[in-house]
Amino acid sequence: MAFRCTLRRLECYRASRLMPYKPSFLFSLISNVNEYERFVPFCQKSKVTEYDPKTGYPTKADLTVGFKGLCETFDSKVVCDPVALTVLADASHHRLFRRLKTHWSIEEASRGRVRVDLEVDFEFASKLHGMMSKFVGSSVASEIIQGFVQQAKIKHKLESENEK
């Protein structure tokens, strides 16, 4: 399920999925920012540049994204909360954006399933980037979460095979 809201040029996209995996497994995938290049559409490179010395979770990361010949690298501040099962990333400080925030959350649902929610709020500083985003904007959250679902299936299968 995906929703869109628009306030001026701020684009807000949300997507949710029910998944049959443990919350801790899903959180470990979402908090592993180094793997984003494997499942986030248009993400060509993802690299954690700072970790919290106490928790080991990322606090800063660089992402390189590309679309239609444009390629940009930007850094994000990352907050991983294993108790609340949330991962927040904010790149609003980067010159490319007026705002870019993502919020992943995980919560128990019914029948042994877990709900994963993704919210992406962004506004480009450049009109050109803003116009380009219209081509992919409406599907961005759905495509990211669909990529995440596929990544979870692959990782879960690998873990299951390693346990044998």
Swiss-Prot record:
GO terms of molecular function: molecular carrier activity; ubiquinone binding
Any Gene Ontology CC annotation: mitochondrial inner membrane
**Does Translocase show up as a keyword for this record?**
no
Q: Which InterPro entries match?
A: COQ10-like, COQ10_START, START-like_dom_sf
Q: Where is the signal peptide?
A: none
Where are the bilayer-spanning segments? none
- Where in or outside the cell is it found? Mitochondrion inner membrane
Taken from the UniProt record, the cysteine pairs bridged by disulfide bonds within this chain are none
- Top-level lineage group: Eukaryota
Membrane topology recorded in Swiss-Prot or TrEMBL = Peripheral membrane protein
Alphabetized UniProt keyword annotations: Membrane, Mitochondrion, Mitochondrion inner membrane, Ubiquinone
Q: Subunit comment for this entry?
A: Interacts with coenzyme Q.
Describe its function: Required for the function of coenzyme Q in the respiratory chain. May serve as a chaperone or may be involved in the transport of Q6 from its site of synthesis to the catalytic sites of the respiratory complexes.
| Protein name in UniProt | Coenzyme Q-binding protein coq10, mitochondrial
| Annotated organism of origin | Schizosaccharomyces pombe (strain 972 / ATCC 24843)
